[in-house]
């Protein structure tokens, strides 16, 4: 997991690494479209979900309530924990541990999503091992990874694993209850809960030349080193974020959770993950500008334009300062990059700028595409 140091001069968050469900065969999912408070029985062996009868559940099944008006952490943990895995990496470039979750599974193999920084040291050589809830350990291979989004996909040769249910991060609100599941400090299947503290929080992680830019979900659910790549879930057990970073005090006196955790929104992550599975590589959106890194004012100043890219085609002049994107205020260059990367290539966005000649103007810009690093 990455540790984050908050800078008081802006809303930007500079992060450092935090290292440390549907069921098998598509029988059922952790979240359903049933009304709130549906009573179900979960088969202890297969994890298949059945509506509870008038006499309750048999001894071979566990009684749970899905979608209760107040978040039912016990139910969510029981349903989703089997989809979350522990990841261990041993490599010459460094060893570590983290978390991941099963995204897709067929009869012979499964795809697992985690953070790039969890497995980066084994990108060229090393051993990656995935541990399931039942204690089974499986060798894993890297399918693809994206440094810019801090995401990676692993493959294991074990099929019919329970998979997590995908939620919609665009529909969550500040104050909503959430649950985090992962393996902090190697402690597998650790479950914590909290709320969504903020949305669209600009977070950068990594070092110069290998930075990740995340339009993060902020949560106060306890997230600690080793939680990287784990699941952030909504009140119905659907994944809405990939846990990636935590904030720490700049003094370095506190290295664990201080109630400031950050997750990659699942809508953003899913696009990248699907591309990695399909092609082994992914893409990122391009505005077509080079920012003036010496600019110290509010906003992101465009130093120059890329020929024939979106910004130039839209008529934005060089020297303009971006102040908002789709109505979201932009405080600085990082905020602009993070916001742009939250879109898919080909999206059309509204960019509001202060013109070099003075005055404000909005432009409709279609984002280009480029290979992600």
Question: What residue ranges belong to the model's regions?
Answer:
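A short beta-strand micro-motif
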Residues: 37-43, 87
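PDZ domains, with a preference for the canonical peptide-binding region formed by the helix
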Residues: 120-121, 324-352
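Glycine-rich, low-complexity segments
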Residues: 3-38, 55-78, 94, 130
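Conserved PDZ fold ligand-binding element
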Residues: 112, 311-334
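A structural signal for beta-strand boundary/capping segments at domain termini and interdomain linkers
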Residues: 135-137, 348, 360-362
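Serine-dependent protease modules
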Residues: 68-297, 307, 337, 341, ...
């Amino acid at each position: 997991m990455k540790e984050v140091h908050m800078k008081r001069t802006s809303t930007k968050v500079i992060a450092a690494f935090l290292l440390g469900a549907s069921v098998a065969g598509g029988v059922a999912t952790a979240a359903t479209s049933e009304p709130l408070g549906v009573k179900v029985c979960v088969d202890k062996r297969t994890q298949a979900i059945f509506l509870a009868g008038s006499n309750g559940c048999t001894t071979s099944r566990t009684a749970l309530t899905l979608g209760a008006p107040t978040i039912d952490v016990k139910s969510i943990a029981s349903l989703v924990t089997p989809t979350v895995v522990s990841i261990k990496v041993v490599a010459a470039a460094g060893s570590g541990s983290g978390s991941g979750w099963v995204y897709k599974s067929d009869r012979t193999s499964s795809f697992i999503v985690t953070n790039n920084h969890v497995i980066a040291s084994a990108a060229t050589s090393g051993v990656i091992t995935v541990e399931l809830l039942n204690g089974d350990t499986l060798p894993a291979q890297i399918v693809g990874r994206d440094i810019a989004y801090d995401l990676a996909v692993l493959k294991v040769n074990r099929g019919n694993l329970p998979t997590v249910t995908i939620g919609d991060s665009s529909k969550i609100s500040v104050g909503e209850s959430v649950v985090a599941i992962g393996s902090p400090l190697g402690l597998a299947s650790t479950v914590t809960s909290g709320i969504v503290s903020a949305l669209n929080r600009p977070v950068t992680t990594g070092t110069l030349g290998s930075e990740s830019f995340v339009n993060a979900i902020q949560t106060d659910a306890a997230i600690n080193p080793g939680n990287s790549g784990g699941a952030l879930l909504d009140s119905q057990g659907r994944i809405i974020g990939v846990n990636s970073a935590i904030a720490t005090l700049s003094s370095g006196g506190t290295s664990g959770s201080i109630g400031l955790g950050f997750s990659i929104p699942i809508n953003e992550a899913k696009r990248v993950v699907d591309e990695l599975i399909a092609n082994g590589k992914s893409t990122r959106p391009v505005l077509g500008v080079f920012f003036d890194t010496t600019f110290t004012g509010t906003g992101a100043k465009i130093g120059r334009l890329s020929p024939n890219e979106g910004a130039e085609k839209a008529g934005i002049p060089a020297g303009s300062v971006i102040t908002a994107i789709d109505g979201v205020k932009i405080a600085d260059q990082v905020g602009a990059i993070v916001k742009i990367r939250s879109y898919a290539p080909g999206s059309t966005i509204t960019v509001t700028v202060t013109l070099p000649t003075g005055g404000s103007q909005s432009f409709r810009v279609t984002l280009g595409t480029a290979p992600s690093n």
